[in-house]
Design a protein with these regions (language model features):
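Bacterial Sec-dependent N-terminal signal peptides
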Residues: 1-27
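A non-transmembrane, solvent-exposed segment enriched in polar/low-complexity residues
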Residues: 17-141
Length: 141
């Protein structure tokens, strides 16, 4: 009976680890150092705090459990820093002056792959608008 009890406890401990997230982040943005970041999810048209942490020497860390995959956002005070998919696994966040990247889990890899492709399309659109404007200025509409 004792063995069954310990086996059950061990099984429950392993099952609880399967639904945990671990977000490790780095940043070279100097204004973030010493600031508090908040991990929030949208619930009933309002953002609910899930976790918070301090940025120390450009590093921050969120950790907890999640029952299902959810869209979440990292905020600094009331300012949105970036969106991510809150799912079980190890998530890596990189914030710098030129880009924001989240990776390490399947849905975050897909989400930021989409953002990267979207940015490429936006850049192509700006280039086409610039060429169009140049053609108008040159009189070759």
């Amino acid at each position: 009976m004792n063995r069954i009890f310990y086996a059950f406890i061990a099984l429950m401990a392993l099952a609880s680890c399967a639904n945990s997230y671990d977000i490790s982040g780095t940043s070279n943005v100097s204004t973030l150092d010493g600031r508090m970041l908040y991990l929030k999810i949208l619930e009933n048209n309002d953002f609910k705090n899930v976790d918070s942490c301090d940025v120390v020497h450009g590093q921050f860390h969120f950790q907890g459990s999640v029952d299902s995959m959810k869209m979440a956002n990292i905020f600094m005070d009331d300012d949105l820093v970036l969106p991510l998919v809150l799912e079980s696994g190890s998530i890596t966040v990189k914030l710098d002056d030129t880009q924001q990247v989240v990776s390490g889990t399947p849905m975050n890899d897909k989400l930021f792959g989409f953002f990267k492709k979207y940015q490429q399309i936006q850049n192509q659109l700006r280039e086409l608008v610039h060429k169009h404007d140049q053609a108008i200025m040159n009189g070759s509409d």
